[in-house]
Amino acid sequence: MYHNSSQKRHWTFSSEEQLARLRADANRKFRCKAVANGKVLPNDPVFLEPHEEMTLCKYYEKRLLEFCSVFKPAMPRSVVGTACMYFKRFYLNNSVMEYHPRIIMLTCAFLACKVDEFNVSSPQFVGNLRESPLGQEKALEQILEYELLLIQQLNFHLIVHNPYRPFEGFLIDLKTRYPILENPEILRKTADDFLNRIALTDAYLLYTPSQIALTAILSSASRAGITMESYLSESLMLKENRTCLSQLLDIMKSMRNLVKKYEPPRSEEVAVLKQKLERCHSAELALNVITKKRKGYEDDDYVSKKSKHEEEEWTDDDLVESL
């Protein structure tokens, strides 16, 4: 259960400010490592600022969701949610300048398939990359190389509680204990849209799965012009606990505000930041502190050592077959 989980104890935070501090600290720690190797100065413009890292994380998180949405065989929502949570957690304590988000996002999806027991083979997984067989083999090698690192950086807390199960539970509860609403299924589509949008925010790191699920349902009801105050007060027995009800309403308002204020990264900005990111991962700077036998995922234009044939490196454009 969530309330006894590592997610509640270690990965649910008190505020957006706390998340910002963790990310800024990860950025600072990497800068210190990079300066210590003597190749850059403390204020070198090669470094990404914390807000620039966040923009890139938003971009790659969206790419992760797009990759999962067209995955074949169809990926269950719980697996997608788990992969998304892994990605968010990883970059709370790590910098994109040290670990490239392109390979981390794929490793998150790969690990989520295993943990959530979505039976897909390694060749099937990389087969979803728009790449040659050699390129797919290269991608799989990189994923396997980073899998243990990801597990370690998640502190071996691999079980993720997503809002999808409580969401279905609330719909069942509405059907059985709230006859005022004749057909609760009319709320599903808009609520699903809300869940998709809130997955792009930090809500998973701030609120419980049941709070997110309930907010999705009530937001859907509100958009449909359906009042559900009596469901909260009577069915959820919050009538006598006005403090708890008030806190719940405040939480829901905060979540809706998260969705409203979310701004997708602009393509022009992302293009500039990706150039800075690739420079951080370039061989001449070698800011990545684990540059052991790299296969070139850091550079979109990388071509592996040529012998009898040339092998083309996979890039961001190879992540999905179609968007």
UniProtKB/Swiss-Prot annotation:
GO-annotated biological processes: protein stabilization; regulation of G1/S transition of mitotic cell cycle; regulation of transcription by RNA polymerase II; transcription initiation at RNA polymerase II promoter
Basic and acidic residues composition bias: residue spans: 302-311
Chain spans, region Disordered: 297-323
Subcellular location: Nucleus
A GO CC annotation given for this chain: cyclin-dependent protein kinase holoenzyme complex
Name of a matching Pfam family: Cyclin_C_2
GO MF entries: cyclin-dependent protein serine/threonine kinase regulator activity; kinase activity
Keyword Cell cycle (UniProt): yes
Residue list for modification Phosphothreonine: T315
The UniProt record lists the keyword Lipid metabolism: no
Phosphoserine: residues carrying this PTM: S5, S132, S304, S322
Start-end of Acidic residues biased regions: 312-323
Subunit structure: Associates primarily with CDK7 and MAT1 to form the CAK complex. CAK can further associate with the core-TFIIH to form the TFIIH basal transcription factor.
Protein name as it appears in the record: Cyclin-H
The gene coding this protein: CCNH
